[in-house]
Curated annotation (Swiss-Prot):
InterPro entries: Glyco_hydro_22 (IPR001916), Glyco_hydro_22_CS (IPR019799), Glyco_hydro_22_lys (IPR000974), Lysozyme-like_dom_sf (IPR023346). Pfam families: Lys. Lysozymes have primarily a bacteriolytic function; those in tissues and body fluids are associated with the monocyte-macrophage system and enhance the activity of immunoagents. Disulfide bonds join C6-C127, C30-C115, C65-C81, C77-C95. Signal peptide: none annotated. This is Lysozyme C-2. Its EC number is 3.2.1.17. GO terms for molecular function: lysozyme activity. CDD domains: LYZ_C. It comes from Capra hircus (Goat). Lysozyme C is capable of both hydrolysis and transglycosylation; it also shows a slight esterase activity. It acts rapidly on both peptide-substituted and unsubstituted peptidoglycan, and slowly on chitin oligosaccharides. The active site is at E35, D53. PANTHER family: LYSOZYME C.
Length: 129
């Protein structure tokens, strides 16, 4: 599923991400825009670590989810990677909460590149929240 911006903003807010660990909803929207273009089915393979990033948050199979094929995987969120690509993003959000709790928002390269030190207010502008 490819979310519309405001639809995703409302969904992330309902699932408790707005202000979670001090990270604003606008920052989560910026992160997901640059990681996956709001697409739950996004995947990207990383040849160096032989791992794959999954779903709207591009959660990595080396550390956080189990795809059954990544060498020396940890499965920190105790979730199958395929579950992170479901239209219902509750499991993906739960894992993102765990990641930000353990590592902070800087765990996401796209956030560091595109959102940190930027005005991210436009990501929630015009959305009825």
């Amino acid at each position: 599923k490819v979310f519309e911006r405001c639809e995703l903003a409302r969904t992330l807010k309902e699932l408790g991400l707005d202000g979670y660990k001090g990270v604003s909803l606008a920052n989560w929207l910026c992160l997901t825009k640059w990681e996956s273009s709001y697409n739950t089915k996004a995947t990207n393979y990383n040849p160096g670590s032989e791992s794959t990033d999954y779903g709207i948050f591009q959660i990595n199979s080396k550390f956080w989810c189990n795809d059954g094929k990544t060498p020396n995987a940890v499965d920190g969120c105790h979730v199958s990677c395929s579950e992170l690509m479901e239209n219902n993003i509750a499991k993906a959000v739960a894992c993102a909460k765990q990641i930000v709790s353990e590592q902070g928002i800087t765990a996401w390269v796209a956030w560091k590149s595109h959102c940190r030190d930027h005005d991210v207010s436009s990501y929630v502008e015009g959305c009825t929240l």
